[in-house]
């Protein structure tokens, strides 16, 4: 493989081979990006948006959790820095993060997601946004964040990446097509090993879908999505599909074939008609239970993302669970913003835990707030507050992420930020029991201890 340092020729929608290898730049601490989009959301956006997943993966062979985020440079420039960090579960130490890409944008929509293959190579998928291109990177060594190969430079907004047991890579992404009224369309493509991609062979899954969440369980892909009609803010309805051939064909939850591309709002994959209920939904997470059945976490709202403040109430965190025959819908708690995002996990004992900024913070009715850990012991029917992780904070916390295949020492991580004006953004993580730690903003050593937060 030829290795050199230099510019990369853009390869839009072409089959790509390894093109460049470089030594990524060692960072000097954990600092999140601050970002705003007028009228909808603002604040600490290091782990935004929810439609890029996964952002963190626990690797049992290395006993480390690797996680990506959008960072800010030490000199305070607002250029988004694509960063990767690691947590050593044996030593309880954080690695000094690595700068993989200094992006020519401050748009947090370009934040990355990641995956780890069966050989331990770390793949990073840097999202595209408008004229800003996406990229795919692979670590030069297994379970190592010091150097990466650049594989692809292409257009892939909202990437979601999963690696099957046979080594094939599935990538879901979005395209914008203003020519036929379907502004946002969902596509997927597959690579044999993640190093070569042919985006011309992508499968078009849905028109007007856009916002989706995916997960892979024992060879079966699940996808949940809403209807985001022609770019309007009225995202509604809840749909679920599954695939046993890594996205070539799809079926409904009960196994009936789905014609592609799906056209909304009428499709057999609809599991709840929120359009008739005049409600809006904001997808947060999709996981599977011990039987492989899907569970969805989402916000149910009375108004779209521009309907912030009390006029958007009531807003509820909701779960939708499939038991193999039918769907069950249950509320967890109320929230005060459509983008009060979080994640859901189920442990080996069947305990459900949802974590996110569900309490109002110092800036109510804006993105995020105070982080709370919620628990259910009856498959999501009833919930209790297990622990309030943050309180009396200076800034709102937002966009809590939980690693795929998590280990209890590193359960959730996120950033904070002032939602009313540009500010610094610190990064935090917690363990399964809700013990809270802050990641140091300044680091001069390869590995450091996290800072306990009382």
Question: Where do the protein language model's features map onto the residues?
Answer:
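Bacterial N-terminal signal peptides that target proteins for export
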Residues: 1-10
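A cross-taxon signal for low-complexity, glycine/charged-rich
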Residues: 7, 23-24
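Extracellular, repeat-based ectodomains that mediate carbohydrate processing or recognition
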Residues: 25-454
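Bacterial N-terminal signal peptides
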Residues: 9-20
């Amino acid at each position: 493989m030829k290795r050199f340092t230099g510019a990369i020729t853009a390869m839009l929608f072409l089959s790509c081979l390894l093109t460049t290898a470089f030594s990524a730049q060692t960072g000097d601490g954990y600092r999140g990006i601050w970002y705003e989009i007028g009228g909808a959301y603002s604040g600490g956006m290091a782990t935004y948006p929810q439609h890029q997943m996964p952002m963190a993966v626990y690797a049992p062979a290395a006993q480390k959790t690797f996680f990506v985020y959008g960072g800010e440079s030490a000199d305070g420039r607002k250029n988004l820095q694509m960063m990767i960090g690691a947590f050593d579960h044996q030593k309880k130490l954080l690695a000094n993060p690595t700068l993989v890409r200094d992006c020519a944008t401050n748009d947090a929509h370009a934040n990355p997601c990641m995956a780890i293959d069966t050989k331990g190579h770390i793949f990073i998928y840097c999202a595209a946004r408008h004229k800003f291109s996406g990229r795919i990177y692979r670590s030069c060594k297994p379970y190592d964040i010091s150097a990466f190969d650049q594989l692809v430079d292409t257009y892939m907004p909202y990437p979601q990446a999963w690696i099957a047991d046979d080594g094939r890579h599935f990538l879901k992404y979005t395209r914008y097509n203003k020519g036929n009224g379907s502004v946002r369309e969902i596509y997927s493509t597959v690579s044999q090993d993640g190093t070569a991609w042919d985006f011309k062979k992508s499968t078009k899954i849905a028109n007007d879908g856009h916002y989706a969440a995916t997960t892979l369980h024992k060879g079966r892909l699940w996808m949940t999505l809403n209807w985001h009609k022609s770019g309007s803010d009225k995202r509604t309805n809840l749909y679920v599909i599954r695939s046993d051939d890594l996205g070539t064909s799809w079926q409904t939850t009960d196994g009936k074939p789905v014609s592609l591309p799906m056209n909304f709002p009428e499709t057999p994959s609809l599991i709840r008609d929120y359009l008739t209920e005049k409600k809006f939904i904001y997808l947060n997470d999709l996981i599977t239970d011990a039987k492989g059945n899907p569970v969805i976490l989402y916000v149910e709202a009375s108004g779209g993302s521009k309907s912030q403040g009390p006029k958007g109430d009531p807003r509820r965190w909701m779960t939708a669970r499939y038991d193999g025959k039918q769907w069950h819908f249950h509320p967890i708690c109320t929230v005060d913003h459509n983008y009060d995002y979080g994640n859901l996990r189920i442990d080996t004992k069947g305990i459900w835990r949802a974590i996110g900024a569900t309490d109002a913070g110092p800036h109510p009715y804006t993105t995020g707030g105070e982080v709370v850990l919620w628990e259910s012991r009856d498959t999501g029917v009833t919930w209790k507050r297990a622990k309030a992780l943050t309180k009396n904070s200076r800034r709102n916390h937002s966009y809590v992420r939980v690693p795929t295949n998590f280990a209890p020492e590193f359960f959730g991580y996120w950033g904070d930020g002032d939602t009313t004006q540009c500010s610094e953004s610190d990064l935090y993580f917690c363990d399964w029991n809700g013990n809270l730690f802050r990641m140091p903003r300044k680091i001069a050593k390869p590995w450091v201890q996290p800072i306990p937060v009382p």
